[in-house]
Design a protein with these regions (language model features):
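Condensing-enzyme catalytic core mediating Claisen C-C bond formation in acyl metabolism
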Residues: 1-81, 180, 186-262, 266-270
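Localized chelating/binding microdomains
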Residues: 2, 12, 45, 92-96, ...
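Short, surface-exposed acidic
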Residues: 29-39, 50, 104-108, 138-140, ...
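Acyl-thioester C-C bond-transforming condensing/cleaving domain
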Residues: 30, 80, 84, 93-109, ...
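A structural motif shared across PLP-dependent enzymes of the aminotransferase-like
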Residues: 56-61, 120-127, 290
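Phosphate/pyrophosphate-binding loops at sites that engage ATP/ADP/AMP, CoA/4′-phosphopantetheine
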Residues: 93-110, 266-283
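Glycine-rich phosphate-binding loops at beta-strand->alpha-helix junctions
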Residues: 113-122, 282-290
Length: 290
């Protein structure tokens, strides 16, 4: 089996209370009906604070505001802002993952890098920029999982799992970074209101090795047993992520939780059969659409 021996995280510098973000949103929308809907969504979100790569959303932010002009930043400006800030946050998450195992990028010897993002598209991409920032060897093998949205970390971990099973000495670094708040736009549809309520910016990194390598390094962690995924075709229109002239636009239908509830038993039953497990043997399930 493969093993996740460390997980690191990082967030951008601008931290805002949800109440301050709500105030910003209501001013940006400047519409009584939208403000009323936002207040209901914000108060039921369960979120207290969010981080952003831009200072606009909270009272503590200083410097030039990204959304200061009446005209929304176009897609080019949003991509440029991502290119300025995303890699630094990703590198911070990577360094945090190594710090937790009392190691460093330089001494550990990463052989493979897998990057994950859906909030920007450009090439050469963040994979090469991260290699340069970390001074990784030029022959480090690279893979990128792009534009797969909320579930993208799982395909990335699956790739890492296959690598460590095929190459017992492989040391795989997986890093995900998303700057969702760059795509803020005050549109009145429910999908947009909901996405403006819950998403923030940040990065996470995981170091994966084979069990044999982990034992050799005397490191514990989370062992990965198996993977299983299935596509629920009837739900493909409930979530989406589309490139528009102004921003990347989210499709996030309020029916998603009910749709999952209607199909989760069937999914788990198939999972039991495919993986030869019993649902009751799993202490806790984490269910996430994507």
């Amino acid at each position: 089996m493969s093993r996740i021996i460390s997980i690191g995280t990082a967030v951008p510098q601008y931290k805002s209370n949800q109440s301050d973000i709500l105030e910003f949103m209501c001013k940006a929308y400047d519409n009584e009906i939208a403000s009323r809907k936002l207040k209901i969504l914000f108060h039921s979100s369960g979120i207290e604070t969010r981080h952003s790569a831009v200072p606009d959303f909270g009272k503590s932010g200083t410097g030039k505001k990204f959304f200061a002009d009446e005209n929304q930043p176009n897609i080019e400006k949003r991509m440029f802002k991502y290119s300025e800030t995303a890699v630094g946050i990703a590198v911070d998450a990577i360094k945090d993952s190594f710090k937790k195992i009392n190691s460093s990028v330089e001494s550990f010897g990463i052989t493979h890098l897998i990057t994950v993002t859906c909030t920007a598209l450009y090439a050469p991409g963040i994979d090469i920029e991260i290699m340069e920032k970390l001074n990784l060897p030029h022959d480090t093998e690279r893979n990128s999982v792009n534009f797969m949205g909320c579930n993208a970390a799982f395909p990335a971990l699956k790739i890492a799992d296959k690598i460590t099973k095929a190459e017992k000495n492989a040391k795989v670094l997986v890093v995900c970074v998303e700057l969702c708040t760059l795509h803020f736009q005050p549109k009145y549809d429910t999908d947009n209101l909901l996405s403006n309520t819950i998403f923030g910016d940040g990065a996470a990194a995981a170091i994966m090795v084979s069990d044999e390598q982990a034992e050799h390094l005397n490191l514990k962690g989370l062992s990965i047993n198996r993977f299983y995924s299935a596509l629920l075709k009837n739900g493909k229109n409930l979530m989406g992520w589309n490139v528009k002239p102004i921003n990347f636009e989210m499709v996030l239908n309020a029916k998603v939780p009910a749709f999952i509830g209607d199909h989760i038993r069937e999914f788990i039953s198939t999972c039991e059969e495919k993986l030869n497990i019993k649902a009751e043997s799993i202490g806790k399930w984490a269910v996430h659409p994507g």
